[in-house]
């Protein structure tokens, strides 16, 4: 929808298929939705870690488990998208003010993540996860998510993308601080 109509992600944009590994469908590299699916899973696991439960069994947290991961996804996108634009992996017909990324792209990711999580919550099962799983094994995706913005800040600084670099570092520090506060 976004590449053809310009809706959702801040205007018409296109991917540079020469820089995207693997196959594509309708000029959208499959690695993009696969990557974002993995990121959403990592973010959900992180939210489980800081909320002190399982996202499958937090019925009173429905709104939190829709909004918090959506906001975290946008914060991560503030770090990752400037790198991709700088590497010319994708571009918009009308460049945005934030390192070439239009503001509405971030609104689009907030909405898209919220919608994906809403559908997930509608169809989730009551599958019981073994409670005897080791803490680090169970929460390794969430722990990795804590580090991801800091890891992404390095290429930001290497390319002179200072604001996304600092956002990445501060974001990681905040994520780690929340985990420490919630698990002490």
Where are these regions (language model features)?
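Aromatic-rich, lipid-facing transmembrane alpha helices and their immediate juxtamembrane interface loops
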Residues: 1-184
